[in-house]
């Protein structure tokens, strides 16, 4: 009799060898890394090769080049350090100069397919010693009918309760002109304990945002005729400002109708 139920003694002319009969899968006893079960069914097939995806993900696939545009994919970067205040600041993201390079637009029309916001918000030496929490609100806006030499201020576009940027919504009479495409925030904490003097900002958004310029070549807000892309930033603390060191990259395609 064998001592274990899974053992059997196999006799051979040379020797007796004790073997273990294993009727399970050979992968059962192998040490494997823990797997993370993805609940989103669409994301589970995202990194698979095309021939292994179901038919639905092969047929109804978003095109690499936006409709009505042509390649190659061009890139424009905006790198700047800003002083984010309670009253808010604005950056024009769709400033692209007309020219022949990979950072220029060919004609009046182009489409911003995606945007990549990378950087950090931080406090200086004097502010980070104070006990406070400061949130920086980011609003990515579409200006459908740009007008004037510079974009409007934060307080002119947004309606706020008690001048609080976290409660900002578009003014009722401007909702047809301005639309909030994306909204996010980052938090820094000052004080001797639990201090978080800087916070990383890393966002990637697909927009398919069509921009139209006039006949001028310079990439300025005053030369926009349709759909300027704006980034508004405001901090929630009334007296302590925050510095934002950001690198903003837009990936765009030229329109066929130029």
Curated annotation (Swiss-Prot):
Q: Which GO terms describe its biological process?
A: symbiont entry into host cell; viral penetration into host nucleus
Residue ranges annotated as motif Bipartite nuclear localization signal: 3-20, 202-249
Q: What is its main location?
A: virion
Q: Per its record, what are the GO molecular function terms? A: DNA binding; structural molecule activity; zinc ion binding
Purpose of the protein: Encapsidates the viral DNA into characteristic twinned ('geminate') particles. Binds the genomic viral ssDNA and shuttles it into and out of the cell nucleus. The CP of bipartite geminiviruses is not required for cell-to-cell or systemic movement.
Q: Which family does it belong to?
A: Belongs to the geminiviridae capsid protein family.
* Listed name of the protein: Capsid protein
């Amino acid at each position: 009799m064998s001592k274990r139920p899974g053992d059997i003694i196999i006799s051979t002319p040379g020797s007796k060898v004790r073997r273990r009969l294993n009727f399970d899968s050979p992968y059962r006893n192998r040490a494997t890394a823990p797997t993370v079960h993805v609940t989103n069914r669409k994301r589970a097939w995202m990194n698979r090769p095309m021939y292994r995806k179901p038919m639905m993900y092969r047929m109804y696939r978003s095109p690499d080049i936006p409709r009505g545009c042509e390649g190659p994919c061009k890139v424009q970067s905006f790198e700047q350090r800003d002083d984010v205040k309670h009253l808010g600041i604005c950056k024009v993201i769709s400033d692209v100069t007309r020219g022949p390079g990979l950072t220029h637009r060919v004609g009046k029309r182009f489409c911003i397919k995606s945007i990549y916001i990378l950087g950090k918000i931080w406090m200086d030496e004097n502010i980070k010693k104070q006990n406070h929490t400061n949130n920086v609100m980011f609003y990515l806006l579409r200006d459908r009918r740009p007008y004037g030499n510079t974009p409007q201020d934060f307080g002119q576009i947004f309606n706020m309760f008690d001048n609080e940027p976290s409660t900002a919504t578009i003014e009722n009479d401007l909702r047809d002109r301005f639309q909030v495409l994306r909204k996010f925030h980052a938090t820094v904490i000052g004080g001797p304990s639990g201090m978080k003097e800087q916070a990383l900002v890393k966002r990637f958004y697909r927009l398919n945002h069509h921009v139209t310029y006039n006949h001028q070549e310079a990439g300025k807000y005053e030369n926009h005729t349709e759909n300027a892309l704006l980034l508004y930033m405001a901090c929630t603390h009334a007296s302590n400002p925050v510095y934002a060191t950001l690198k903003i990259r837009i990936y765009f395609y030229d329109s066929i109708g130029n």
